[in-house]
Regions:
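Beta-rich carbohydrate-recognition and catalytic domains
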Residues: 1-17, 26-72, 83-130, 142-147, ...
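Beta-propeller and closely related beta-sheet repeat lectin domains
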Residues: 20-23, 77-80, 134-137, 183-188
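Glycine- and aromatic-enriched low-complexity segments, predominantly in secreted/extracellular proteins
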Residues: 224-255
Length: 255
């Protein structure tokens, strides 16, 4: 057992020192642990995103910045990283302080998952004018075209956001899915059928009667609809029919 980082009181306020929102991946024989860090006095105790690495799970390397801003009121957070077929890497994050307002979802692309801080932050701006905000998650699937598909979820809206051009700024589209908005939805490319994406949602932040919904959608299905969705309410499983708009087909299971 090893301890990577220790923080203070877990409130999103400057002058406190929490660490949170971890994400891990393996890269070139090292385990890379990303997290949001509010302990840096040189950052006037504002939040930034960092990583540390280990080869033995006992000893951890120095803290390396992944996203930081000079303005201490800015709060980048919720790092998620995926590899693209070109060998590049994509990082998505929520950004309080964004010109778009709220916690707009931004991304960075780098040729190494260890050098995101050297790359510019880019807002996800779908062609339909929608605004993804908060607690993003991303995966890459080989389905959907010669470049595959980058799939991004956010915490405030029901759709997924797709990019079939390796992250080009002007190539984001919106896909309506049966899964409801949730804090925070996780995505998984199904290994036996990479055209299918699993969405796992645990309900809203602070909810008193939340549900857990698992939905699968097909990136290559035209004009699909949701087949089934479910949730557990007061200990009882409830099921119903649902519909999704646009490209994609989905079904859900609740517990």
């Amino acid at each position: 057992m090893s301890s990577v980082a220790r923080g203070g009181e877990a409130l999103p306020e400057n002058d406190l020192e929490p660490v949170w929102e971890p994400f891990m991946l393996i890269y070139e024989g090292e385990l890379v642990l990303y997290y949001s860090d509010q302990r840096d006095p040189d950052n006037t105790l504002g939040q930034k995103m960092v990583h540390q690495t280990t080869t033995d799970l006992l000893n951890w390397g120095p803290i390396v910045d992944d996203v930081h801003y000079d303005n201490a009121t800015f709060r980048p957070g919720m790092p998620i990283i995926s590899e693209l077929p070109t060998g590049d890497w994509i990082l998505t994050y929520e950004f309080f302080g964004a010109e778009e307002g709220g916690f707009h979802v931004y991304y960075r692309i780098s040729d190494s998952p260890l050098t995101f801080d050297a790359q510019p932050g880019i807002p996800i701006l779908p062609a339909d004018g929608s605004s993804p905000e908060g607690s993003p998650y991303n995966v890459w699937s080989p389905a959907g075209g010669e470049n595959g598909t980058i799939v991004v979820s956010d915490g405030n809206n029901t759709p997924l956001y797709l990019n079939r051009a390796l992250g080009a700024e002007d190539a984001w589209t919106t896909l309506e899915v049966p899964a409801g908005a949730s804090y925070t939805r996780a995505l998984l490319v199904l290994p036996n059928d990479p055209s299918r994406i699993m969405i796992v949602a645990g309900g809203v932040l602070g909810g008193e009667d939340n549900s857990v919904l698992v939905t699968t959608i097909d990136l290559e299905e035209e004009n699909g609809k949701g087949n089934k969705h479910g949730h557990r309410q007061h200990g009882k499983a409830c099921w119903g029919k649902g519909r999704g708009k646009g490209r994609g087909k989905g079904r859900g299971h609740g517990w």
